[in-house]
């Protein structure tokens, strides 16, 4: 923890091609070993495939997918008198976006298509239609929060 008070959050940079912050965040999530040009090629290719398959703006498709994947609740472990409880808490907006992007990338890497461009494009399209592994992950998290609703009074 810094002694000089809270650290200022860096401003989010808009993407040069689509002019959207979410696209640049997605590029940074795809990034491996600092190869940003490769990550950009993958994301732009996937968004272009989304445009070809749906005929709509790919950024709108991405936003719709993220809205379907963003969690509203999550569980956090809280130790109370020797027992650990899974306490449901609300997710901050920034964290929900980060989690949604992380899940999109993680589950697109696990898909069986040939190239990463195809995998990411299909995961985005599935998520925008309410399907796919990333949407299932959100549903599982919400189910867990609902199951542990009795411990909500331990919220901090």
UniProtKB/Swiss-Prot annotation:
GO molecular function: rRNA binding; structural constituent of ribosome; tRNA binding
Signal peptide: none
GO aspect biological process, one term: translation
Entries under CDD domains matching the protein: uS7_Bacteria
Keywords: Ribonucleoprotein, Ribosomal protein, RNA-binding, rRNA-binding, tRNA-binding
Keyword match Zinc: no
GO cellular component: small ribosomal subunit
Gene3D superfamilies noted in UniProt: Ribosomal protein S7 domain
Cited InterPro entries: Ribosomal_uS7 (IPR000235), Ribosomal_uS7_bac/org-type (IPR005717), Ribosomal_uS7_CS (IPR020606), Ribosomal_uS7_dom (IPR023798), Ribosomal_uS7_dom_sf (IPR036823)
SUPFAM superfamilies: Ribosomal protein S7
NCBIfam families: rpsG_bact
Its biological purpose: One of the primary rRNA binding proteins, it binds directly to 16S rRNA where it nucleates assembly of the head domain of the 30S subunit. Is located at the subunit interface close to the decoding center, probably blocks exit of the E-site tRNA.
Family: Belongs to the universal ribosomal protein uS7 family.
Assembly and binders: Part of the 30S ribosomal subunit. Contacts proteins S9 and S11.
Record's protein name: Small ribosomal subunit protein uS7
Species in which this protein is naturally found: Corynebacterium urealyticum (strain ATCC 43042 / DSM 7109)
Gene name, Swiss-Prot/TrEMBL: rpsG
């Amino acid at each position: 923890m810094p002694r000089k008070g809270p650290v200022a959050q860096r401003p989010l940079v808009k993407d040069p091609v689509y002019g959207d912050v979410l696209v640049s965040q997605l590029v940074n999530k795809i990034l491996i070993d600092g190869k940003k040009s490769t990550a950009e090629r993958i994301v732009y290719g996937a968004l272009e495939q989304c445009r070809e398959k749906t005929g709509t703006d790919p950024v709108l498709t991405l936003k719709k997918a993220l809205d379907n994947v963003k969690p509203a609740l999550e569980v956090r472990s809280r130790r109370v008198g020797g027992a650990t409880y899974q306490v449901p808490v609300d997710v901050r907006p920034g964290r929900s976006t980060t989690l949604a992007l992380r899940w999109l990338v993680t589950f697109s890497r696990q898909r069986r298509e040939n190239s990463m461009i195809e995998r990411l494009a299909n995961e985005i399209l599935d998520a925008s239609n309410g399907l796919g592994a990333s949407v299932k992950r959100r549903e599982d998290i919400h189910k867990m929060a609902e199951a542990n609703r009795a411990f909500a009074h331990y919220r901090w």
